Amino acid sequence: MEKFGLKALVPLLKLEDKELSSTYDHSMTLGADLSSMLYSLGIPRDSQDHRVLDTFQSPWAETSRSEVEPRFFTPESFTNIPGVLQSTVTPPCFNSIQNDQQRVALFQDETLFFLFYKHPGTVIQELTYLELRKRNWRYHKTLKAWLTKDPMMEPIVSADGLSERGSYVFFDPQRWEKCQRDFLLFYNAIM
């Protein structure tokens, strides 16, 4: 084990081991001699008040190279924007909510839940909320969860008309799944 320890490394650093000195690249262990580079920069070898790192950027810095402008092309879709490159095309509609409403109607429930939770306070959240309402999903304000009536069971309305008991399907955003359970629902707790 000693041959892999620090004791075996000391003769290598001091260049005492003649066997290894012929096959081992000592610049990998000891580093490179920077005195010639310091001399080319006009720095005396034993200057204590000047540090090399203050003037040396990087050995890979290409300061003499002129900047080359890369080849590029302008896509045709960019040239068709009004006011850009003298285009006369009618302006595109970037904020069209009507197109987004049609797209949102095609999504599955799980995708709508993802959009609802991913984009809080945006138009996308409002559109997904409206679409989920169309699909009979309601948001429970206290539980902070979405629920809908189980289509196979009709809930029983209470005598006072303020609540109903039945089987509901809840969407659990933590486990990202729909789960069914019996529940007493108060109407004032849902949106």
Curated annotation (Swiss-Prot):
Species name: Saccharomyces cerevisiae (strain ATCC 204508 / S288c)
This protein's UniProt keywords: Activator, Cytoplasm, Nucleus, Repressor, Transcription, Transcription regulation
Record bears the keyword Hydrolase: no
Pfam families: NOT2_3_5_C
Principal location listed in the UniProt entry: cytoplasm
UniProt superkingdom: Eukaryota
The name this protein goes by in its record: General negative regulator of transcription subunit 2
One annotated GO biological process: transcription elongation by RNA polymerase II
GO cellular component, one term: cytoplasm
Gene that produces this protein: CDC36
